[in-house]
Amino acid sequence: MASIEEIRQAPRADGPATILAIGTATPPNAIYQADYPDYYFRVTKSEHMTELKEKFRRMCDKSMIKKRYMYLTEEILKENPNLCEYMGSSLDTRQDMVVSEVPRLGKEAAVKAIKEWGQPKSKITHVIMCTTSGVDMPGADYQLTKLLGLRPSVRRFMLYQQGCFAGGTVLRLAKDLAENNKDARVLVVCSEITAICFRGPTEAALDSMVGQALFGDGAGALIVGSDPDLSIERPLFQMAWAGQTLLPDSDGAIDGHLREVGLTFHLLKDVPGIISKNITNALEDAFSPIGVSDWNNLFWIAHPGGPAILDQVEAKLGLKEEKLAATRNVLSDFGNMSSACVLFILDEMRKKSLRDGATTTGEGLDWGVLFGFGPSLTVETVVLHSVPLNC
């Protein structure tokens, strides 16, 4: 019989956790930002609020978003008018939607990642599922496992209600699992549906309207493992380090509360300032062991939040305009998809690097940073290392 010491000596991986495949998915319903103020005030029966509509139009114009995707269509909203009220009793209606749609959209992204990976799904050993869109038991991790037909013995982790920083959280967890379990292959899925937080406008809560102007639906999926078999697996990025921190003096900066009216968001105006004020410390903690101090020598994958956050971070660090190009492209094409955003940006980064003829998956650079920002304020930082591209 094995001793506890022998069990503890189970083999661990030799190399760093590596992203081996990426998949993304959105609902088919595209919403164009230029048309959204008219649409939003019409479907919520708020067209009489003319001054508020003009404020909302300015929010949309400043968002730097061209297009978003949403599960909610005009037909669905007509059938469920309680979603269109500002504080309508609606949690059951919202839950009925997201409990099925979150894993379904997650499956679409996962299928693409598994196809790119090219290995049998029976080799998946762990599943990390993440969403801020509703909550249920058994969870979306269970539903995803059933939808994909994964092994009953797959080890599952479910993250609910973490918010926008969680795209970094799932990478940190996947890193620990891959590096501490030899031959582990971790399926990571972030799936977000705004049906949980869509609501009509009110002058009394402009921060709620900011969310209505920014958020979109999407799901991202990764396959993560250490010591890839280079004859059948294609590394995209390695994860060298991952950490989480709470920013000082940020209590109440971003809050979300799940209530009978759905998920409500509240944010302070100085969120961009709080993040930009503290980002240098986060970077120094992560990169001083590597010897990187020029932040323009990194490739950047930053949760977009909104354009004000990106602008202030860019100014604070003296970043060249092109450093946040991948992040801004995703914000423009998809909006803020909460936890899924950074997975879309990873996908954009490796594809853009290939299109541009770069020598690595990180725009020709070796080292990069992935940032997730979210409630409390919490910051997730992941140090990435690119891999060579055979252009």
Swiss-Prot record:
EC number: 2.3.1.74
InterPro entries in UniProt: Chalcone/stilbene_synt_C, Chalcone/stilbene_synt_N, Chalcone/stilbene_synthase_AS, Polyketide_synthase_type-III, Thiolase-like
Residues forming the catalytic site: C164
This protein's pathway: Secondary metabolite biosynthesis; flavonoid biosynthesis
Keyword Transferase: yes
PROSITE patterns in the record: CHALCONE_SYNTH
GO MF annotations, alphabetized: naringenin-chalcone synthase activity
Catalytic activity: (E)-4-coumaroyl-CoA + 3 malonyl-CoA + 3 H(+) = 2',4,4',6'-tetrahydroxychalcone + 3 CO2 + 4 CoA
Pfam families (UniProt xref): Chal_sti_synt_C (PF02797), Chal_sti_synt_N (PF00195)
Top enzyme category: transferase
GO biological process, one term: flavonoid biosynthetic process
Alphabetically ordered keywords of this record: Acyltransferase, Flavonoid biosynthesis, Transferase
UniProt similarity note: Belongs to the thiolase-like superfamily. Chalcone/stilbene synthases family.
Purpose: The primary product of this enzyme is 4,2',4',6'-tetrahydroxychalcone (also termed naringenin-chalcone or chalcone) which can under specific conditions spontaneously isomerize into naringenin.
Protein name: Chalcone synthase
Species: Dianthus caryophyllus (Carnation)
Lineage: Eukaryota, Viridiplantae, Streptophyta, Embryophyta, Tracheophyta
